[in-house]
Amino acid sequence: MELVNIFLETDAGRVKFVIKNTDDVCASELINKFVELLSEYIHIDQSEFYLVVKDKDIFYFKCDRGSISIVNNEFYVFDEPLLFVKDFTKITGVEFIVTETMPCRIIPKNNHAVISVVTNHKFYNGLSL
């Protein structure tokens, strides 16, 4: 299972948030684990953001100052071709892909950068536009 709208920025490039071997783990535990991982880089209790999780389907969650809730699917596909790296030395920040209906307010920790990129790529009637 992976986050498709939040990535780590490093000295070498962008890195995915992925949790492997998730067959026997419930979705709420995985979301809590993603938020726990993010808490190393941002103040969760002061931030508001969305997590878009992809397994076989895409699921949307909102984290509002640490309170997590599932939200309706917005039909954004998050399928732009992005480049990722596997080897890096230092994490420099966190990148959030946001949409017009998924605003965010992020308070970083320890001088980490917060990068935001906007997308409006939606799924319409069987087409990804």
Swiss-Prot record:
The keyword RNA-binding does not apply. Pfam families: Chordopox_E11. InterPro entries: Virion_core. The keyword Cell wall biogenesis/degradation does not apply. Keywords: Late protein, Virion. Induction: Expressed in the intermediate phase of the viral replicative cycle. One of its GO terms (cellular component) is virion component. Belongs to the orthopoxvirus OPG073 family. This is Core protein OPG073. The lineage of its organism: Viruses, Varidnaviria, Bamfordvirae, Nucleocytoviricota, Pokkesviricetes.
